[in-house]
From Swiss-Prot:
Name recorded for this polypeptide: ATP-dependent RNA helicase eIF4A
Renumbered ranges of motif Q motif: 38-66
Motif (DEAD box): 187-190
Domain Helicase ATP-binding: 69-241
Keyword Cytoplasm assigned: yes
Keywords, comma-separated and alphabetical: ATP-binding, Cytoplasm, Helicase, Hydrolase, Initiation factor, Nucleotide-binding, Protein biosynthesis, RNA-binding
Organism of provenance: Encephalitozoon cuniculi (strain GB-M1) (Microsporidian parasite)
Notes on the domains: The Q motif is unique to and characteristic of the DEAD box family of RNA helicases and controls ATP binding and hydrolysis.
Lineage: Eukaryota, Fungi, Fungi incertae sedis, Microsporidia, Unikaryonidae
GO CC field: cytosol
The protein's assembly and partners: Component of the eIF4F complex, which composition varies with external and internal environmental conditions. It is composed of at least eIF4A, eIF4E and eIF4G.
Pfam families: DEAD, Helicase_C
Length: 425
């Protein structure tokens, strides 16, 4: 497979079943072509949108942005797949703001996300990019008062970003109109098309007045066969963007494991079971000079154990899990983003979509089941974002290696045993 040259990147081919864009394939020409551009000016974007783009430091489009923005502007459905941290949110936000008519006091863009944290981050990106355009953005999600959402919708937002449950509720009580939707964005689409969200997403889609004409854009780092099947029911002649970099090997992230061999033979509870992992983690913290890191573990109960143990050993950290209120989670994230705390313990809420700029290392204290293998990709994708280098360390027992190796084979990636003399510098 050849790497695409800069000249070849300018065009991709359109087929009768849709358009497919792959970064590391020869691009075959066809009668109709979609143009990709190297600079923001080349897109012919609104002047005030360009100001917003440059004000937040977007110097040039990333590859996913090159591939996705123009098809959306041209009115095409798209299904985009790209590794975490490549600029997917910026891609659909820029395109949406370009096609949105700010002179119309109606909601034209609807963006769904699986968690409030991701929805809030997406809404903030729209606000930042649209700050010179007069773009009005409303965030609708569980955990906030219904009354506050009603007030937000009374301001006639151009763009609504939210979680499926709250968005559906606001539609049902006639507070959110679907009469003028131009673009329906499904972020973290692999999660949104799973059984837990799928019916809500379909229900919301059915409520869009002009659903035969509305554009749909799906973005994710992973899709499985069932999710692809569901997407085919919704999308019409889509542009398919697949930028996974050789079957999900996450570019720029070095992946390692530490094999602790047998789990403790005698234990009274979960802390005893986790103790060898906690000691190993603490030893790394003490001996290495690390920037900020995230520690992932599957359950909120285990996350609390890890947090309490580190606090008892006087290691500065933060905890974010489902046991916290929404307000507490937001305060925790804001503190951590602001540089408070060396590490953040997460039960999984942060494995998707959340962007923490200065994160250098991700630690995984357990391995997701093979059925939830995409969780691994989303976890380690918190490091190495936007082309920066990252490190992922899996601290595991012998029996967990089977799952880790199965994930390694499935994604055609490399997870090495951590060398004894490894330096995080």
């Amino acid at each position: 497979m050849k790497q695409v040259t800069e000249q070849a990147e300018d065009f991709v081919d359109t087929r009768s079943s849709g358009t497919e864009i792959r970064e590391f394939e020869d691009l075959r020409s066809d009668s109709s072509q979609i143009r990709m551009f190297d600079t923001w000016e080349d897109y012919g974007l609104k002047e005030d949108l360009l100001k917003g783009i440059y004000s937040i430091g977007f110097e040039t489009p990333s590859f996913i942005q090159k591939a996705a923005i123009q098809p959306i502007i041209d009115g095409r459905d798209i299904r985009a797949q790209a590794q975490s941290g490549t600029g997917k949110t910026g891609a659909f936000a820029v395109a949406a703001l370009q096609i949105c008519d700010m002179s119309q006091d109606v909601t034209q863009i609807l963006v769904l996300a699986s968690t409030r944290e991701i929805a809030a981050q997406n809404a903030a990106r729209f606000e930042d990019l649209g700050c010179f355009m007069g773009a009005r953005v409303a965030l609708l999600s569980g955990g906030s008062p219904i009354a506050a959402d009603k007030v937000a919708l009374e301001k006639k937002p151009h763009i609504v970003v939210g979680t499926p449950g709250r968005v559906e509720h606001m539609i049902n009580i006639n507070e959110l109109s679907m009469d003028n939707i131009k673009l329906f964005v499904i972020d973290e689409a692999d999660e949104m098309l799973k059984a837990g969200f799928q019916e809500q997403v379909k229900s919301i889609f059915r409520r869009i007045t002009n659903k035969d004409e509305v554009q749909i854009a799906m973005f994710s780092a992973t899709y499985d066969e069932e999710e692809l099947r569901v997407s085919e029911e919704i999308l019409i002649n889509p542009v398919i963007i697949d930028l996974r970099y050789n079957d999900q090997t996450l570019k720029g992230i070095r992946q390692y494991f530490i094999d602790l061999r047998k789990e403790p033979p005698f234990r009274k509870g979960r802390e005893d079971y986790l103790l060898p992992k906690l000691v190993t983690l603490y030893d790394i913290f003490r001996k290495q000079r690390l920037g900020q890191s995230i520690v992932f573990i599957n359950s909120k109960e285990d996350a609390r154990i890890v947090y309490d143990w580190l606090i008892r050993h006087e290691w500065e950290c933060e905890l974010i899990s489902a046991e916290l209120t929404q307000a507490e989670r937001e305060r925790t994230l804001n503190r951590f983003r602001g540089g408070t705390g060396r590490c953040l313990i997460s039960s999984g809420l942060l494995s998707r979509g959340i962007d923490i700029q200065n994160l250098s290392v991700v630690f995984c204290l357990d391995v997701p089941s093979f059925e939830r293998k995409s969780t691994y990709i989303h976890r380690i994708g918190r490091s190495g974002r936007y082309g920066r280098k990252g490190i992922a360390i899996n601290i595991v027992y012998e029996h967990e290696l089977k799952n880790l190796k199965a994930i390694e084979r499935f994604y055609n990636t490399t997870i090495k045993e951590l060398p004894a003399d490894f330096s995080f510098q």
